Amino acid sequence: MAKTLYEKLFDAHVVFEAPNETPLLYIDRHLVHEVTSPQAFDGLRAHHRPVRQPGKTFATMDHNVSTQTKDINASGEMARIQMQELIKNCNEFGVELYDLNHPYQGIVHVMGPEQGVTLPGMTIVCGDSHTATHGAFGALAFGIGTSEVEHVLATQTLKQGRAKTMKIEVTGNAAPGITAKDIVLAIIGKTGSAGGTGHVVEFCGDAIRALSMEGRMTLCNMAIEMGAKAGLVAPDETTFNYVKGRLHAPKGRDFDEAVEYWKTLKTDDGATFDTVVTLRAEEIAPQVTWGTNPGQVISVTDIIPDPASFSDPVERASAEKALAYMGLQPGVPLTDVAIDKVFIGSCTNSRIEDLRAAAEVAKGRKVAPGVQALVVPGSGPVKAQAEAEGLDKIFIEAGFEWRLPGCSMCLAMNNDRLNPGERCASTSNRNFEGRQGRGGRTHLVSPAMAAAAAVTGHFADIRSIK
């Protein structure tokens, strides 16, 4: 029987399945951070259980860390407690930890792939919704809750029901300046923020194959923003070349044998999907969200929509509420909307290619008066590589702030946040009310578009900036 990639990955990891019971899956990798793990470790301690597979468990600090100093106290008392608990728990249970002073420390979904912890064919979980990022490698990766974190620590397994399957095919070739971020925002604009609910999404088509691994990670990172359980891209030579030689990747003959298996990880001819969505890459322009969910998105050349133009009463009411929160008026061109802050970072867009794209725009220009612009590399290795290439100097000379690695202003759990009423062009993944700070107004864009907003003081079409 022909199978989809998701069905192959799921079936390969079933440990036990009985009639009328949820299947039990084996988990190959468990990624841990300071926010969703303390109670899970406490649960192990209370029942005198060890971590079953400490060698398959990797921890880092990211959500709470300050991006201005390595001082554990800098983001407040709650942050300090969570980070100190992670240090204590990893020491006690034998889990490898990339702490504030470790050269590999960074955002968990940046660290995993760059260290070769993430490999094709794996099941990967983390107490974080954007675990879907790792699906870019042809791995079944999804976020879990704290009680499930404890279950995986204790058993290296997890009960999971089968999801529905969705194929999203992006045909043709994207125009110059159009990035993975624009593609995924255009997809979510078409499906809506709940269009993938109950599904695991496989992204395919010529435009997807043309993406680098970093672009594919951006794509899968935001699968969750259309309501999907996970996102997948079938592994290919691009994947294998990225993985080869990384710290935790197989070596020598083991790598060659792994590649032979990884090549089988693709949807069979004749396999059927529950839902199919198609987009044409050449029709995708630079995208900017205007509302308070990622599905409220338009091209940068469009005008702010009128809620009256929505036929669905729920969408109309949502648009009215979003415009009121965002302080926007229907009919205003997006390029007339001024911004206060710019955030280039997050598990969506903080890798070296993202920083190069932003630096290309920033080079020889200056951040507009009254705008604060932050560049936050996703990890220690990304920061080191950017500095080796001189990107930090380009940003600093242009008036951007060059920060230490961390989740930063994506989620306002640290000391980087928006003040009430401030408008931000952000490369992160969520534009919900208050996501970047109470009363903050978030517009999601690509790194190049964020840099363009920083130097012009408003949203600008990257295609017109030479």
From Swiss-Prot:
Cofactor remark from the record: Binds 1 [4Fe-4S] cluster per subunit.
EC number: 4.2.1.33
Spans traversing the lipid bilayer: none
Residues reported in the UniProt entry to bind [4Fe-4S] cluster: 347, 407, 410
Coiled-coil region: none
Assigned keywords, A-Z: 4Fe-4S, Amino-acid biosynthesis, Branched-chain amino acid biosynthesis, Iron, Iron-sulfur, Leucine biosynthesis, Lyase, Metal-binding
One MF term in the entry's GO annotations: 3-isopropylmalate dehydratase activity
Pathway of action: Amino-acid biosynthesis; L-leucine biosynthesis; L-leucine from 3-methyl-2-oxobutanoate: step 2/4
Cofactor field: [4Fe-4S] cluster
GO biological process: L-leucine biosynthetic process
Pfam families: Aconitase
InterPro entries for this protein: 3-IsopropMal_deHydase_lsu, Acnase/IPM_dHydase_lsu_aba_1/3, Acoase/IPM_deHydtase_lsu_aba, Aconitase_4Fe-4S_BS, Aconitase_4Fe-4S_dom, IPM_dehydratase_rel_enz, IPMI_cat
Catalytic activity from the UniProt record: (2R,3S)-3-isopropylmalate = (2S)-2-isopropylmalate
UniProt keyword 4Fe-4S, yes or no: yes
Function recorded in the entry: Catalyzes the isomerization between 2-isopropylmalate and 3-isopropylmalate, via the formation of 2-isopropylmaleate.
The protein's assembly and partners: Heterodimer of LeuC and LeuD.
Sequence similarity: Belongs to the aconitase/IPM isomerase family. LeuC type 1 subfamily.
Protein name (database record): 3-isopropylmalate dehydratase large subunit
UniProt organism field: Salmonella typhi
Lineage summary: Bacteria, Pseudomonadati, Pseudomonadota, Gammaproteobacteria, Enterobacterales
